[in-house]
Structure formats: structure tokens, C-alpha cells
């Protein structure tokens, strides 16, 4: 994950990430006594929901600053900094849960293999992340605005089709029990700065490719390009498309 994370901005203006994750927790249905790994736990906003039925929840995230915030806000949970592609924790887990994380990691096959190693036979892998076409208007504008200013920028995100990701899971040893791709237009918090806040929170790689003294010009052009599609009723919206899945590890 190449983004530089700001825990305060994340919790203050992008809590919708965790709020939408509540229905994913219901789908995962952690049970009393189960061992659950929250893969990409961030600031820990879903830890209590995952443990509410009596499961023992461990968190893992690639950002030290996010994990520090989670440890301070949610004492009593085992939380670790680690790489989703190659983590090693005391196994096995009954459930690996992940929300809004996997699109940050293009090496999807490595993640799937790591998850499979961490699960017991019959263990569940339940997740949601950006799917094919996610934030297309925003991404296209970020790239176009950069090109117009003479900068060659690249998207850091992995937004696969259902077919592509189902294949990844199958090869890693999973039986896929659910795979959905759906639109979720999401209202951003601030009616004026909502899109800029989103780019500052999630689009750090784009901003890193533009000189800081030109950020304002760059972001203004991104807003200009997206306004006809993503600004309505006085608010900015992100054109999210989500890939939601459930899978079970096949017995060895």
C-alpha cells in the first residue's frame, strides 16, 4: 500500500468506509468462540462489531499510524502492523474479514495465499473492496488533469472484475460462495471540499506526482472535470462500485 494515511482525516471525514462495512459484518456473521482476523483494520472502527457476538478479534494493518490510533482507541484487542501479502500470525483463524483494503494491493494472488494459510480448513474469507469501474470518473479526472499539466500519473488501485477475482480465490484454494459487483454512490462529508478531502485521503500517489505548489491548480481541474457527474444537491459524491465476496477454504 503506497498511500500515506492520515488517521484523523480518515475518522473525521471518511467514516462512511466503516459505516458501510457494518452490513459486511452481518454477512460474515462471526460466532461466539471463533477467532477472527480483521485484515486491513485501519483505525479499528469495526473491531467491536466483529467481536460483539463473542468472537476473539485480531487486527492487522499495513499502516503503523493507523494501528497506533486503533490501539489507543480500542484497548483490549491484539493489533499488529503487517503486510497482507506475507503476514504470519498464530493460526488458524475461523474467519478472515476485510473491508476496503484489497484494492490497495495489486498482488491479489499473494494476499489470497496468505489468507488461505491463516485459515483453518473450512474457514471463511469475507470481504468487500473496489471492483471493476470503481471511482472511474474520479480516476479518469486525476489522470487527465495530470496529463494536461504535463505529468504522467498512474493509478495505485486494483479494481478487478468478478471473473478475475473469483479466479484468484479459486487458485488459492477457496470455494466461492458469493460474488457481487454493485454501484454505491457515496456522499462525501463536506459540501465544498469533499472531493479534495477524498483525494488527500486516498489519492496521495497522484498528489506525489504533482509539485506541491501546483496542487491547488491540479485539484481545481479535477473538480471541474468531475462536477457534471459527481456534484449534485450541493454535495460531492464518489462513484463507488464494490466487489463483495464470501469464500470457504477447501480442505487440504
Can you say where each PLM-predicted feature lies in the sequence?
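Class I SAM-dependent methyltransferase SAM/SAH-binding core
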Residues: 37-39, 43-87
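A short glycine-rich, Lys/Arg-flanked "PGG" loop and its adjoining helix->strand segment in the class I
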Residues: 109-124
